[in-house]
């Protein structure tokens, strides 16, 4: 079964994320559990936790259908010790918030070397950061997102994801989220079913589908291999509809949150309905 949704706003209270997801007939959703552009957040209150859990229960969302995202400020591979410590503390807090909310996944961007350390050193720091966070939490899986490779961001090669996983001690609590826009911008073609087969055969060989814990379904304004992260609505960008239809018809993508981060929230309900329809329709757009 496919879990299909979008990254919805939690403005006004975390419970509102579940309500907004239900309003667009989503069977999955993503959210930030705190302001993603601030380091610190007030601790979760018992009321906030209870209201969130009640809303998820009311609208039939289990933790397997929810893919929270951490703050954009966090860099788990930071080359400077003090800044790395700050990121690690913030990441632990994000994991603990998920734990309190009964959530089992936390999606994050791996990190950046900032042109100050080698890729290898940065990847090792990211893995060590994950180990520290897993040691201080229970029940939450760290879900590494592939990146477009802008600037000094790592995670744009499947080999980067595999290297991080290799350095994580508890393999049962690490996974990956593949963003289609990021993959395309990083040089993994998805424009035809044949290219999708090739890209995900590479993924299966290098990382492994057992680690796939979520997807971000985004078309790309950016061009193929450009290393530029610019999302677009499904079928309106440089990837096109075929990739998303192909994903919907492949059971390797069952049972994980498939999350839209496309640019027009007003058509998320239509995009979700279209994706659901592709599971059975074999040809037409």
From Swiss-Prot:
It is an enzyme of class 3 (hydrolase). Binds 3 Zn(2+) ions. InterPro entries: AP_endonuc_2, AP_endonuc_F2_Zn_BS, Xyl_isomerase-like_sf, Xyl_isomerase-like_TIM-brl. Pfam families: AP_endonuc_2. The gene is nfo. Keywords: DNA damage, DNA repair, Endonuclease, Hydrolase, Metal-binding, Nuclease, Zinc. Zn(2+) 3 binds at residues 182, 229, 231. Endonuclease IV plays a role in DNA repair. It cleaves phosphodiester bonds at apurinic or apyrimidinic (AP) sites, generating a 3'-hydroxyl group and a 5'-terminal sugar phosphate. One of its GO terms (molecular function) is phosphoric diester hydrolase activity. This is Probable endonuclease 4. It catalyses: Endonucleolytic cleavage to 5'-phosphooligonucleotide end-products. The keyword Hydrolase applies. The lineage of its organism: Bacteria, Pseudomonadati, Pseudomonadota, Gammaproteobacteria, Enterobacterales. Zn(2+) 1 binds at residues 69, 109, 145. Zn(2+) 2 binds at residues 145, 179, 216, 261. It comes from the Bacteria.
């Amino acid at each position: 079964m496919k879990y299909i949704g979008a990254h919805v706003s939690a403005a006004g209270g975390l419970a509102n994320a579940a309500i907004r997801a239900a309003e667009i007939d989503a069977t999955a959703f993503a959210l930030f559990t705190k302001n993603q552009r601030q380091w610190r957040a007030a601790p979760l209150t018992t009321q906030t936790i209870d209201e969130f859990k009640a809303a998820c229960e009311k609208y039939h969302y289990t933790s397997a259908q929810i893919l929270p995202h951490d703050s954009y400020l966090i860099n788990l591979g930071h080359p400077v010790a003090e800044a790395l410590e700050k990121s690690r503390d913030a990441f632990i807090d994000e994991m603990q918030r998920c734990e309190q909310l009964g959530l089992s996944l936390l999606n994050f961007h791996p990190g950046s070397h900032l042109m100050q350390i080698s890729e290898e050193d940065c990847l090792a720091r990211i893995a060590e950061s994950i180990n520290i966070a897993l040691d201080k939490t229970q029940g939450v899986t760290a879900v590494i997102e592939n990146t477009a490779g802008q600037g000094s961001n790592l995670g744009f090669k499947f080999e980067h994801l595999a290297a991080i996983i290799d350095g994580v001690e508890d393999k049962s609590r690490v996974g990956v989220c593949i963003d289609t826009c990021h993959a395309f911008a990083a040089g993994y073609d998805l424009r035809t079913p044949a290219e999708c087969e090739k890209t995900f055969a590479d993924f299966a060989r290098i990382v492994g589908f057992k680690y796939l814990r979520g997807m971000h379904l985004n078309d790309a304004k950016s061009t193929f291999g450009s290393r530029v992260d610019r999302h677009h609505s499904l079928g309106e960008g440089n990837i096109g509809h075929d990739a998303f239809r192909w994903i919907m018809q492949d059971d390797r993508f069952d049972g994980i949150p498939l999350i839209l981060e496309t640019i027009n929230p007003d058509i998320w309900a239509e995009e979700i309905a279209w994706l659901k329809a592709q599971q059975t329709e074999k040809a037409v757009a």
